[in-house]
Amino acid sequence: MNTPTTGSHPARYPSAAAGEPTLDSWQEPPHNRWAFAHLGEMVPSAAVSRRPVNAPGHALARLGAIAAQLPDLEQRLEQTYTDAFLVLRGTEVVAEYYRAGFAPDDRHLLMSVSKSLCGTVVGALVDEGRIDPAQPVTEYVPELAGSVYDGPSVLQVLDMQISIDYNEDYVDPASEVQTHGRSAGWRTRATGDPADTYEFLTTLRGDGSTGEFQYCSANTDVLAWIVERVTGLRYVEALSTYLWAKLDADRDATITVDTTGFGFAHGGVSCTARDLARVGRMMLDGGVAPGGRVVSEDWVRRVLAGGSHEAMTDKGFTNTFPDGSYTRQWWCTGNERGNVSGIGIHGQNLWLDPLTDSVIVKLSSWPDPDTEHWHRLQNGILLDVSRALDAV
């Protein structure tokens, strides 16, 4: 990446002392402002290795020409609790912003943008013929026989078109997503919780119907289990081998792991904004990274084309993007720009703008995990910056 020179931003970034986070509070404000950048100090984590590269250091870019088009951009970034923001056009960083106390080489938790990384690894294995998307999940993981995954295909898991008894309420301690997190070590385990992620996945039930979208974080961890089974690698090793080592990343990524060493594929990856932008660059380059091909052009084409709009039931998404869909672990807007995004709670975005050959990364620490208010503000920024790029 080629980056122009600039200065810094004065906004205050809270310290650990301001929050004193615990295992049960680190995801909540104000603790999350610190914890999202220091997750390895809260939850056991493993390195997702990059390959050694001899790359020059990068100077920090400013908001520059983008700010000329959007004079209130920095204010909007501050209002939406932005920790890191980056715009990559082609191979040039044309805009970059970091809150005071957060540096370009700091990692940030991606939350569910991690899902898009997992989907990409699955795509690489589909290209190799090691995973057949049409095959049932239990062809690869027979331990899931008798669960809700006994019958659905790998593609239905990728596209989240399975009816599952899984409440994705991030603030309800009785919800399945909270039990999932406790089993993975993200919170203190309660009496009766499954011992680890593998065991948790085998407990999931549902009516067995398919074809209608239901967002469910467990699906991604099932995909990671399939990845482990067909490669013989731990998921963290597969993520390195099939994606991260090919990006010429500045730093290793990290991923949280449970007591068995299973990587929290659906939400546990942390990396720098610049390295996440490299993932987007690879997608816009047809699946090719500096270290070699990651996924086929056909896989990328299918992601950028979007999935089944008829299957989409997420009104929060379609209220903003009426033609939106979800496919292969990516959110597809269906808008005139063809924007596609990896999205994570608390304001994480990896946004692709094919019209301008640009990638936008926004990493944040919203005080609420997942509300229409914050998504509306966030999507407004991403769309306005995309349109501003037309004139840059």
UniProtKB/Swiss-Prot annotation:
Region (Disordered): 1-27
Reaction(s) catalysed (UniProt annotation): [N-(6-aminohexanoyl)](n) + H2O = [N-(6-aminohexanoyl)](n-1) + 6-aminohexanoate; N-(6-aminohexanoyl)-6-aminohexanoate + H2O = 2 6-aminohexanoate
Keywords, alphabetical: Hydrolase, Nylon degradation, Plasmid
Stretches of the chain forming a coiled coil according to its record: none
SUPFAM superfamilies given in the database record: beta-lactamase/transpeptidase-like
InterPro entries xrefs: Beta-lactam-related, Beta-lactam/transpept-like, Diverse_Enzym_Activities
Entry EC no(s): 3.5.1.46
Active site positions: 112
GO biological process, one term: nylon catabolic process
GO molecular function term, any single one: 6-aminohexanoate-dimer hydrolase activity
Domain of life: Bacteria
Record's signal peptide: none
Enzyme class per UniProt: hydrolase
Pathway of action: Xenobiotic degradation; nylon-6 oligomer degradation
Other notes: The EII enzyme is 100 times more active toward the substrate than the EII' enzyme.
Function: Involved in nylon oligomer degradation.
Listed name of the protein: 6-aminohexanoate-dimer hydrolase
Species of origin: Paenarthrobacter ureafaciens
Organism lineage: Bacteria, Bacillati, Actinomycetota, Actinomycetes, Micrococcales
